[in-house]
Amino acid sequence: MSRAPKLSLNLQFPAGKAWPEHKSLLPKATVAAWIKAALFADAELTVRFVDADEGRTLNRTYRGKDYATNVLTFAYAESEDDPVTGDLILCCPVVEKEANEQGKPLGAHYAHLLVHGTLHAQGYDHEDEDEAEEMEAIETEVLGKLGFPDPYE
């Protein structure tokens, strides 16, 4: 029987920003459980929750897109043999807006985006239809095991 992957996790919320509803849904143990469910190898990850200004700046700087997006993943492993290391950046206002528009509980949407970002940190992508189908299938399976419905329905 294989052992569960180990996770070293650092959570960051922006200083001086009040995100009480978000923070209450995101205790470290909960975030760690969601991420671990999507890990296939040991990992060191930082998850930073940001406001729209920081989200937009990061998306513009690193992706050339001048808007805040829901999740950005910065994966630092240079080869498959390297440990999984990375930063997941979640933009709180965008996550909340999407959850409301999609009629999803905020916690369920955070779980989905954390699983999604964790898969990116491990090299998964959705640049073409086959990659997207594979990634969505893994996300749906992982979220189901965590008790969440299919995020794509």
Swiss-Prot record:
Cofactor dependence: Zn(2+)
Keywords attached to this entry: Cytoplasm, Endonuclease, Hydrolase, Metal-binding, Nuclease, Ribosome biogenesis, rRNA processing, Zinc
A cellular component term, taken from the record's GO annotations: cytoplasm
Annotated positions binding Zn(2+): 116, 120, 126
GO molecular function, one term: RNA endonuclease activity
Free-text function comment from the UniProt entry: Single strand-specific metallo-endoribonuclease involved in late-stage 70S ribosome quality control and in maturation of the 3' terminus of the 16S rRNA.
NCBIfam families: rRNA maturation RNase YbeY
PROSITE patterns reported in the protein's UniProt record: UPF0054 (PS01306)
Co-factor binding comment: Binds 1 zinc ion.
Top-level taxon: Bacteria
InterPro entries, sorted: MetalPrtase_cat_dom_sf_prd, YbeY, YbeY_CS
One Pfam family per UniProt: YbeY
Gene Ontology BP terms: rRNA processing
Subcellular location: Cytoplasm
UniProt protein name: Endoribonuclease YbeY
Cysteine pairings via disulfide bonds: none
Annotated family: Belongs to the endoribonuclease YbeY family.
UniProt-listed Enzyme Commission number(s): 3.1.-.-
